[in-house]
Regions:
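Non-catalytic accessory segments adjacent to catalytic cores
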Residues: 99-103
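Helix-start/capping segments and mature chain N-termini
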Residues: 3-85, 92-96, 121-183
Length: 183
């Protein structure tokens, strides 16, 4: 497993994500996967002003799309992001992506982030960007390893207290603990 030496996650065919094909819904337009570009001086990258969801597709059915989209918008609201699309527009775009790319079992990653219009902690003048990417991902855990039992680790890192971060948002910065626990 390329995530961690003791990981039991199934490796989907390992094509680097920047080399994949298909379409990404990017600020209201379908863009070729490899043609999507975000500037390296993006507020979302430097200050973790990005919120996201992770949604599974099982047998061409999207698992709880409306609930995930509602939570995505709730997270964006907590992060003071005025999303330029409605929940309905996002849901329609997601369904169209799944249908057009013929994903049977996969993963949907909608995300919202602040752009590169200004740098610094203050971000009032940044554009709010929105994208939806999907890809094939048949199973999260290797079925054979799953039968034997899945190993879990307890991170030495703890989630920040509720009064120190937007704990009830699915914000990128809150996931550094998950990343660190895999290293």
């Amino acid at each position: 497993c390329y995530y961690h030496r003791n990981c039991s996650v199934t490796l989907m065919e390992h094509i680097p994500f920047d080399k994949r094909s298909g379409k990404i819904w990017f600020n209201g337009e379908l863009v070729e996967w490899q043609d999507t570009k975000v500037h390296v001086i993006s507020h979302g990258m430097h200050y973790a002003s990005l919120v996201f969801e992770g949604i599974r597709i099982y047998n061409k059915k999207i698992f709880k799309l409306e609930e995930h989209t509602k939570r995505l918008f709730h997270s964006a609201n907590i992060m003071d992001m005025n999303v330029p699309y409605s929940e309905d527009e996002m849901n329609i775009a997601t369904r169209e992506l799944v249908e057009n790319q013929n994903i049977v079992n996969g993963y949907i990653r909608p995300f919202i982030w602040r752009g590169s219009e200004m740098m610094g902690v203050s971000a009032q003048k940044t554009k709010i960007n929105v994208a939806i990417a999907i890809w094939d991902w048949p199973a999260y855990f290797d079925p054979e390893l799953k039968k034997k039992g899945i190993k879990l680790n307890i991170s030495r890192w703890q989630r920040p207290p509720q009064n120190s971060s937007p704990w009830n948002s699915k914000a990128a910065g809150l996931y550094m603990i998950c990343t660190l626990s895999k290293h």
